[in-house]
A protein has these predicted regions:
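Nucleotidyltransferase catalytic core that binds NTPs
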Residues: 1-184
Length: 184
């Protein structure tokens, strides 16, 4: 049987409960068999660089997994594939590196990012290699997106210290101990 792997890339600056809700929903509904979280190295289409460095964002993803329910956390892993890549981060390069014959790959993406997919590097090739699971943003009316009761949490608001309750306990502790985002 072919394994269905969800590739969930993002800046994760920081990873928050909205991201984790998507993970739990995809796995508990058996839409995918496992998920790989991939913090972006240098996202090409972002206007600003991530605030936290790659190692901190990678660690926050690992910590967030520990706070997931038993039975879910075992199906989630974190990859440093993009953090360790020099230069801009492109989804196609990640998929080509992760491509496995015994697996069907699904790129998990927000509806806002998916609306710009044709601007991605080698987008047509990417579309041939993966299926997309499009996640609706709160307040969006995108009918093509998967119906997940998404949480209205923003990494920007977390960084501005407005919603530290929007991250998992282990991630909150990490942010506070390292004083991440404190000056923002």
């Amino acid at each position: 049987m072919v394994s269905r792997i969800g590739i969930y890339g993002g800046t994760f600056d920081p990873i928050h409960n909205g991201h984790l809700r998507v993970v739990v929903e995809l796995l508990s509904r058996k839409i995918v068999d496992s998920i790989i979280l991939i913090p972006a190295g240098q996202p090409r289409l972002r206007s600003e660089a991530p605030v936290a460095d790659g190692k901190a964002r990678l660690e926050m993803c690992k910590l967030a997994i520990q706070d997931l329910p038993t039975g879910i956390r075992e199906q989630v892993s974190v990859s440093d594939i993009e953090i360790n890549r020099n230069g801009p981060t492109y989804a196609i390069d990640t998929i080509l590196e992760l491509n496995r014959q015994e697996a069907e790959l699904f790129w998990v993406i927000g509806s806002d990012a998916y609306s710009n997919i044709d601007h991605w590097h080698r987008a047509s090739e990417l579309k041939e290699l993966v299926s997309f699971i499009v996640i609706d943003r709160p307040g969006s009316d995108d009918e093509s997106a998967l119906d997940i009761d998404a949480l209205d949490i923003s990494a920007t608001r977390v960084r501005q210290d407005q919603e530290l309750n929007g991250v998992s306990p282990s991630v909150r502790k990490f942010i506070l101990e390292r004083k991440l985002y404190a000056s923002k």
